[in-house]
Amino acid sequence: MTDSADYDPVCGMQVHDRRWVTTYRGREYVFCSEGCLALFRRDPALRLSHKGERARYDLVIVGGGPAGLTAAVYASLQHLHALLLARDLGGQAVDTSRIKNYMGYDLVTGPELLGRFRDQLLAQKYIEHRLDEVLSVARVADGFALQTRHGCRYEAPAVIIATGMHRRRLDVPGERRLLRRGVSYRLVHELERYQGQAVAVVGGGNSGIEAATALSRLGCRVTLISSGPLTGDAGDIARVEAAENTVVLTDHEVAAIEGEEQVNGLRVQPRGGGRERFLDVSAVFIEIGYLPNTDCVAPLVDRNRDGEIETGRDCSASIPGLFAAGDVTNGFGKRIIIAAGEGARAALAAGVFVRARQSGTASVQGPA
């Protein structure tokens, strides 16, 4: 845990205002929320030494994206003694430059929408949160035990896995070596840097088309590369194909990314073989989809051939007490609004399960 006055000593979040402040042993500490301040005041020594912490909760939620944040709010509304564990609050959605038609918004940015999610979480009174990575989830006699990267162990009768997905890689020469030196998976952080330059976008789905359109508007000379036909929104496809400064290469694959200290080009070739072409570009934005983050729980749950956790209509996984929500599941439609809805459903179902356990009532659960 970072030992800086700019970081909340309870949860590890960076604090940008000084609304909640206290002094302990001559040092001032700032907090992200009234809840974290209250936890600190109960036992300052414990909160300053997170490593090795052990605690038991009614429910532990793993993941800080739309599904996890919504699940946390709905757990709080049920007055469950719950904990949210996440590497960050926001997830992949924070990197989305434009979100269309999320209810209540015609258009909103990822940082703006997920900032509102986070603010709503921090306003809750019954949910604790920590910035930490869950390494493993194991079954124990009375539920589950979760081990974290900071050396903490938490137990609960119910767990919600809302860990989302991570970006798929091309796995071609030069990709890893030139990461952050022209190779990027996060367009929103790199836009202005490449204004007016020649760039390539790899990926023919919504994300790739959105990236190509955004770069085109900045005056970049864009080559959009897709291994098959473009598959995004029809209107967006028409716009990107009509852009004068954009070339679309379908049925092509990247063979290698070139450059020494910085990307200076890439080699592409038609699918199924054919002559390679060299494209002179200064950046490559990779937008080829995601893989589910299931490493921490993979031995426990049933997954489909894509590695997604199989869930029932109440978001239950294959083991009683274990639930999953959002993009990590086999649910149809990888959308922020769907992930948020699944987070709420999973929390409500987990609440029913926990109360049944507490009352000794049998609970039937499992994918259906």
Regions found by a protein language model. Give the residues of each.
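FAD-site-proximal beta/loop scaffold in flavoenzymes
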Residues: 171, 177-193, 286-338, 352
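Beta1-alpha1 glycine-rich phosphate/pyrophosphate-binding loop at the start
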Residues: 54-124, 209-234
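A conserved FAD-binding loop/helix module that cradles the flavin
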Residues: 211, 319, 325-368
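Short, well-ordered coil/turn residues at beta-beta hairpins
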Residues: 63, 156, 162-163, 169-171, ...
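A Rossmann-like FAD-binding core segment of flavoenzymes
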Residues: 114-115, 121-148, 153-156, 216-313, ...
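Glycine-rich dinucleotide-binding loop and its adjacent helix/turn
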Residues: 45-46, 50-56, 165-213, 218, ...
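Short cysteine-rich clusters marking metal-coordination/redox-active sites
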Residues: 8
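Extreme N-terminal leader/targeting segments of oxidoreductases
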Residues: 4, 12, 20-58, 115-116
